[in-house]
Amino acid sequence: MVLKEIPTENITRPLGRNEVIGLLFRLTIFGAVTYFTIKWMVDAIDPTRKQKVEAQKQAEKLMRQIGVQNVKLSEYEMSIAAHLVDPLTMQITWHDIAGLDEVITELKDTVILPIQKRHLFEGSRLLQPPKGVLLYGPPGCGKTLIAKATAKEAGFRFINLQPSTLTDKWYGESQKLAAAVFSLAIKLQPSIIFIDEIDSFLRNRSSSDHEATAMMKAQFMSLWDGLDTDYNCQVIIMGATNRPQDLDSAILRRMPTRFHINQPNVRQRKDILKLILENENVESAVELSEIAKQTDGFSGSDLREMCRDAALLCVRDFVHQESPEEDFIRPIRQEDLQRAIEKMKKSKSAGVHEAFMQVPLD
């Protein structure tokens, strides 16, 4: 009965032009409101939103500093660009590294020279710069300093890549960030992608690896292979590690140029001590050769810490003297360095594990 009361012409008649426009307008408004509402909700629940905004501001600032303003970057490239280091702001040069003259000379010949003198090597594929360089050896021996000095002296853009930058909770985002690393480096070439503690990121693959991590590593290596096929590409991936045995064999294949940065010998320790104490107030009677002989097994960072302890002894004597007859801190003496050596040896021989085991846990 109800259907009979509805005029059939109102059901079958076509919509008018104004009605169609009105319907499309309402659908457009509804779609826009739905889109922005969902986008706002996703941004609201994203715990990294604030960090992403700050990273974008930092990236834009760094891009202006290095003189790159007309290059368009994607959202993912902006996230990676936040880890750019301006070569002009890096204070590290070859003169700040002592005891590694042979490594520095080989780096200059095999990595820097083929890029700075490209016109001399254009006709040879064998003389092209390597796409992967590995610095390995004990901690505190100058691996990171060498990487920064290489970028500084060669004028490369330096991307200090943190593995945590490539991790994202959304599926597929890590792969996009990995791709952005290489696309950004190519846009900014010549450039160095430096990965410190590379073994924590590209270690041996196993069946227990998470699916997202395995996919990210696979894509990273695939993009890396793309650098090898493009002989005009001026992008170098440089890694540093204390545990080269933990690196995946596929990664080692992609890093054919390797430098072993070992603990310094007596001559190298003397050179390092000269560099550390070069601008310090030191007595002329100090025998650095003797100090170098007594510091067997010390790394470069150990020697710096030892010299700092010796300098602090001079400060303590000045502060605690009963009748301050002098208003200046005395120079570093031989006995100050001897005491600092003994302190460093005790801390090195104590053993961190043994010290922690003596701490009560309840």
Swiss-Prot record:
Keywords: ATP-binding, Cell membrane, Membrane, Mitochondrion, Mitochondrion outer membrane, Nucleotide-binding, Peroxisome, Postsynaptic cell membrane, Synapse, Translocase, Transmembrane, Transmembrane helix
Residues annotated for ATP binding in this entry: G137, P138, P139, G140, C141, G142, K143, T144
First-tier enzyme category under EC: translocase
Segments traversing the membrane: 20-42
Subcellular locations according to the entry: Mitochondrion outer membrane; Peroxisome membrane; Postsynaptic cell membrane
CDD domains: RecA-like_ATAD1
Record-listed E.C. numbers: 7.4.2.-
Gene Ontology CC, one term: postsynaptic membrane
Topology feature Mitochondrial intermembrane, residues: 1-19
Cystine pairings recorded for this chain: none
UniProt record, GO biological process: anatomical structure morphogenesis; extraction of mislocalized protein from mitochondrial outer membrane
Record's catalysed reaction(s): [protein]-with a C-terminal TM segment(out) + ATP + H2O = [protein]-with a C-terminal TM segment(in) + ADP + phosphate + H(+)
Chief place of localization: mitochondrion
Family note: Belongs to the AAA ATPase family. MSP1 subfamily.
GO molecular function: ATP binding; ATP hydrolysis activity; membrane protein dislocase activity
Stated name of the protein: Outer mitochondrial transmembrane helix translocase
Membrane topology label: Single-pass membrane protein
Record flagged with keyword Phosphoprotein: no
PANTHER family for the chain: AAA ATPASE, PUTATIVE (AFU_ORTHOLOGUE AFUA_2G12920)-RELATED-RELATED, OUTER MITOCHONDRIAL TRANSMEMBRANE HELIX TRANSLOCASE
